[in-house]
Amino acid sequence: PIRVGILTVSDGCSAGEREDRSGAAVVAWVASRGFQAAAREVVPDQIGRIASVLLEWCDDLRLDLVVTTGGTGLGPRDVTPEATWPLVRREAPGIAEAIRLRGREKTPYAALSRGLAGIRGTTLVVNLPGSTGGVMDGLEVLDPLVEHAVGLLRGEAPPHDPPGVAGEGASPVRGGAP
């Protein structure tokens, strides 16, 4: 199974002042997909604490996917991208762009998210916003991508046609000769 780490970044949640609804939404999504929630933690908005967990989960536990929630906005304490950026070896900008685009369908404020997506070793790391709506938007984007992405990172060769596209007897060439 795909092994997932869920890291909530929130001063309020880490202090026990607020319920971690966004992390709970990710856990529910992981279960609904049949993935394994291999690690879950809540940390304050501190670069060192965030980076420490990311390093452990990517390098030691070698999780397939790490989803962070929170700390991606413009506020002075929002530092999740700053903690993530130095640790990822390769970017996956299309994922972060797609998450922002999905959010923009519902609120213009989604454009203010600075969340990143990238790869460390064989782990895909994705920063999601802290709001439950932002998390749901992000999970909608990740849903059709995760298994293919993890397969590629594992060195497997999954089929390249996404569900409902080409394959299954359909011609990938439009307007070509009969």
Give, region by region, the residue ranges found by the protein language model.
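Non-catalytic beta/alpha edge segments that cap or flank active sites
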Residues: 1-178
